[in-house]
Amino acid sequence: SCMKAAPMKEVSIRGQGSLAYPGLRTQGNLETLSGPNDATRGLTSLADTFEHVIEELLDEQEVIQPSKENKDADLYSSRVMLSSQVPLEPPLLFLLEEYKNYLDAANMSMRVRRHSDPARRGELSVCDSISEWVTAAEKKTAVDMSGATVTVLEKVPVPKGQLKQYFYETKCSSKGYAKEGCRGIDKRYWNSQCRTTQSYVRALTMDNKKRVGWRFIRIDTSC
């Protein structure tokens, strides 16, 4: 999120950024990956197929989604994974949710989205962020919904042994544009700052009374 503070008198405009692609976060587009040949046309066709699959998955997700009156549904997150090793890719549901959120915010259909992606228009994100898998051993503690500090358990017992808890966290990049303020804010008049914001996810934790259970805890989820 971008926080704006009191106006400033004079500050020079400087800084540079990189392309930000909602959802998959890749730079460039399929047309720029190679020259105008059969391979490029094949990649474009593959992209259309991929987006068609995403559209079907999102339609199915809307059908099985719980009613809006269910508050737990609003707290659901795909950023937690139980695995025996570090996941190599972002969670699929996270990519789908991020992609859907962008479409909803832009109020456009999937077909319109294909012809107006940020990579083609040269758009830049307001704040640069970084996403990575974090283990419970690295987090150690977290704050639950009641405001209490709880211990995040590293391993979760399963019928055939134990699995580690991994959290997919997103925070402001220290090497990006954050130090210069929010991109797009006129520094001659405003002082801005990119800040990491948090959301609730469900994880296996232990409170100060040694009671183990699944609780909603806060983790970094956006910048």
UniProtKB/Swiss-Prot annotation:
Protein name per Swiss-Prot or TrEMBL: Neurotrophic factor BDNF precursor form
- Claim: Mitochondrion is one of the keywords in the record: no
Recite the UniProt keywords alphabetically: Cleavage on pair of basic residues, Disulfide bond, Glycoprotein, Growth factor, Secreted, Signal
Propeptide span(s): 6-114
Q: What PROSITE patterns does the entry give?
A: NGF_1, NGF_2
Which pairs are disulfide-linked?
127-194, 172-223
Please give the residues the UniProt entry marks as glycosylated: 107
Name the domain of life: Eukaryota
Q: What does this protein do?
A: Promotes the survival of neuronal populations that are all located either in the central nervous system or directly connected to it.
**Which family is this sequence assigned to?**
Belongs to the NGF-beta family.
Q: Give any single GO term for biological process.
A: neuron projection morphogenesis
